[in-house]
Amino acid sequence: MAHCDFVTNSLIQNATATLHTNRGDIKVALFGNHVPKTVANFVGLAQGTKEYSTQNASGGPSGPFYDGAVFHRVIQGFMIQGGDPTGTGRGGPGYKFADEFHPELQFDKPYLLAMANAGPGTNGSQFFITVGETPHLNRRHTIFGEVTDPDSQKVVDAISTTATDGNDRPTEPVVIDSITIS
């Protein structure tokens, strides 16, 4: 078990996640050196190596958790949110974990990847990517990555301006086909 933890810790220190969506790829630099537990959770769910007790986005009990999930909430000028296997905004992996804040990570620019939650200590699988400065979220949501690639930022911007219904749900599904970690 210690060897597995070492491999995981080595991987998350400088990991990059690529969200392959039906609108294009979004490459995210993960902050494993600042928020290792949050990054390990995301990487484990993305790769299907972390246990969860609900069905994943593909409807199965195991394997990559996010494959087939949608961005279920999009608010222009604010953020795009995904990671819920049910696509409703109420789903998750069947567990919750504590917030992990780092003083160097602040919502002072766009394109930050952070955990969505329903209050302190309620992180699970849902995440969002900001499209503007959102300082009111500081110390409320764990920042664990950043979209730094200009082409990926264009994909985020395009998703953030997609047509939505009255519940901020895209009228045409924005699907996360898969996530690769490198």
Curated annotation (Swiss-Prot):
Biological process, per Gene Ontology: protein folding
Pfam families assigned: Pro_isomerase
Catalyzed chemical reaction(s): [protein]-peptidylproline (omega=180) = [protein]-peptidylproline (omega=0)
Residue ranges of domain PPIase cyclophilin-type in the record: 13-181
Region called Disordered, residue ranges: 161-182
Listed GO CC annotations: cytoplasm
Entries under InterPro entries matching the protein: Cyclophilin-like_dom_sf, Cyclophilin-type_PPIase, Cyclophilin-type_PPIase_CS, Cyclophilin-type_PPIase_dom, Cyclophilin_A-like
UniProt entry keywords in alphabetical sequence: Cytoplasm, Isomerase, Rotamase
GO molecular function list: peptidyl-prolyl cis-trans isomerase activity
Subcellular location: Cytoplasm
Protein function: PPIases accelerate the folding of proteins. It catalyzes the cis-trans isomerization of proline imidic peptide bonds in oligopeptides.
Family: Belongs to the cyclophilin-type PPIase family.
Protein name: Probable peptidyl-prolyl cis-trans isomerase A
Native organism: Mycobacterium leprae (strain TN)
